[in-house]
A protein has these predicted regions:
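Compact, glycine-rich, soluble single-domain proteins
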Residues: 1-79
Length: 79
């Protein structure tokens, strides 16, 4: 599942960023493997807006498609 598959209000952990360019861009936002993010908004054919800590980031759809995520442990959707 990728970041662009999530819906508003979802909390997820960044699992993997395989593309080195995307990883470098995400690190600039303070987002890396293991980071917990909350989806604030998913704009149709536009960016995914996420919150990490007190910061909000608009991540373009192409970048969001390159970021693999999982739901946190204990989330029923992991079953």
């Amino acid at each position: 599942m990728t970041l662009s598959d999530l819906k508003r209000g979802d909390v997820a952990l960044i699992q993997c960023i395989t593309n080195d360019v995307v990883r470098a861009q995400a690190i600039r936002f303070g987002i890396s493997e293991g980071s917990e993010i909350t989806v604030e908004e998913v704009l149709r054919a536009g960016p995914v807006i996420v919150q990490r800590g007190n910061m909000h980031y608009a991540i373009g759809r192409n970048l969001a498609n390159e970021i693999s995520v999982v739901y946190p442990l204990g989330d029923a959707r992991n079953a």
